[in-house]
Amino acid sequence: MEYLLQEYLPILVFLGMASALAIVLILAAAVIAVRNPDPEKVSAYECGFNAFDDARMKFDVRFYLVSILFIIFDLEVAFLFPWAVSFASLSDVAFWGLMVFLAVLTVGFAYEWKKGALEWA
């Protein structure tokens, strides 16, 4: 137990100092901040023109779909790097576990492709 405390003490000190610095900076900003909002500063548009349309315009769902697919495959790469580094010392369970993971992602990618989620036309 004492060995673990010696190993992780620098990390705990770093996290404590980072948290303390963040709290000090937030409190300093709250104390020093100027609070005199006038109607011009809190208006939606500071350019002087009134809004022509509603600010909430429709956004194509395909952009969200592409971003979700990017996150999924980015996580796949994040899991593949440690697996590739320790490939020589993997057990059979770890190897086949990641093969199942890759198979599920491949099936999901094939499904998205077949449904036309990656088509923009």
Swiss-Prot record:
InterPro entries: NAD(P)H_OxRDtase_bac/plastid, NADH_UbQ/plastoQ_OxRdtase_su3, NDAH_ubi_oxred_su3_sf. Keywords: Cell inner membrane, Cell membrane, Membrane, NAD, Quinone, Translocase, Transmembrane, Transmembrane helix, Transport, Ubiquinone. Its EC number is 7.1.1.-. The keyword NAD applies. It catalyses: a quinone + NADH + 5 H(+)(in) = a quinol + NAD(+) + 4 H(+)(out). The keyword Cell membrane applies. It is a multi-pass membrane protein. GO terms for molecular function: NADH dehydrogenase (ubiquinone) activity; NADH:ubiquinone reductase (non-electrogenic) activity; quinone binding. It is found in: Cell inner membrane. It is an enzyme of class 7 (translocase). One of its GO terms (cellular component) is plasma membrane. The chain crosses the membrane at residues 11-31, 65-85, 93-113. NDH-1 is composed of at least 14 different subunits, Nqo1 to Nqo14. The complex has a L-shaped structure, with the hydrophobic arm (subunits Nqo7, Nqo8, Nqo10 to Nqo14) embedded in the inner membrane and the hydrophilic peripheral arm (subunits Nqo1 to Nqo6, Nqo9) protruding into the bacterial cytoplasm. The hydrophilic domain contains all the redox centers. Belongs to the complex I subunit 3 family. This is NADH-quinone oxidoreductase subunit 7. It comes from Paracoccus denitrificans. The gene is nqo7.
